Amino acid sequence: MSIRNVSIIIPCYKASATLRRAVASALTDAPSDMEILLVDDGSPDDTGALCDELAAADPRVTALHRENGGAGAARNTGLDAASGEWVLFLDADDALLPGLWSALDGVITDADMILFGLTRVSTGDIQPTDYLPAGEYADLAALGGALSPLLFDTGLLAAPYPKLFRRRTLGGLRFDDRLQINEDVLFNIQFLQISSAIYCLHGVYYKQYDTESGSLSRRLRGDLLDAERITRPALAALLRKNGLDPAPYEHTSRLRACLNQYGLLAGCRGDLPYARRRALFAEILADNDARAALQERLRNDPNKLLAVPYRIGVAWNWPGMLAAYTLIKQRLL
């Protein structure tokens, strides 16, 4: 079955600075049977008016308005309104890249998910075909050694992009809008539990502007470890369903969460209080593998002087020192 009739869902919250770019990128060379659903998530600025303006300018664009509920809730509103055979999620501060529609024209597949590559402003190109040949894969086990990097190293399988979902298979599946983080990871895991196959498309067709100030990757938050705990049972169930031992993947998931949470604490500004920082550092250092990985990373840190307190705090398991240093550094630098 060829790829036609795609619904693109764009959740919008205070997105007036980037939304035109996102919509223009989706419309470039797009087929007439494609639809774009702009979901204004109760934005307090002029985002809602811009959604209406863009919808008035092209019949393929529809503006939807809802009370603020977060990205997951906004995506759910889009899913409820979608009519396409396929669904593609695009963030309002990101963009689709030229060539996607022509590449999809050449795809004939019965798979329920089509996965392609993205480029991040911070790190460059990542695509599934860096790890395995293009084509259809019957289940996760068929991905072999590519599964772990696609899940954890690149996040290509875990994020709601860069991919298409067959809407018929989605059925009533929705994002858990009670979660503040990882609701997209849980959504993908749940979809993979009910889907048949994955098609890996060669090419980079999604651009993620992850260095902009509103990006989650640049905001200090303290819930990454809790979020990983919430999604771990669903991940284990998915892996068992595909005949895989979940233990090594659970270990990697936990290690990644520890390293990412450490990175946010050490590298991002925010108003997280000392007690919460200390508790998070203590939990990270209690994981021996995470502590060893951090020691190795800090040995190679190019910021020699600034890294000294981190090296001491990690080596001597002093979470209080690490918490205090991050606060002091934030105030002085």
Regions found by a protein language model. Give the residues of each.
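Short, acidic, metal-binding catalytic loop of nucleotide-sugar glycosyltransferases
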Residues: 24-33
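Glycine-rich, basic loop-to-helix element that forms the pyrophosphate-binding segment
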Residues: 66-82
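Short aromatic/hydrophobic "clamp" motif used to bind/position activated sugar donors
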Residues: 87
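Acidic helix N-cap motif at the loop->helix transition within catalytic regions
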Residues: 18-20, 45-54, 95, 99
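N-proximal low-complexity "stem/linker" segments adjacent to membrane-targeting elements
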Residues: 1-25
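A conserved acidic beta->alpha catalytic loop
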Residues: 40-50, 67-68
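Membrane-interface aromatic/basic loop that binds lipid-linked glycans or pyrophosphate carriers
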Residues: 267-333
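Donor-binding/catalytic cores of nucleotide-activated saccharide
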Residues: 71, 92-202, 206-224
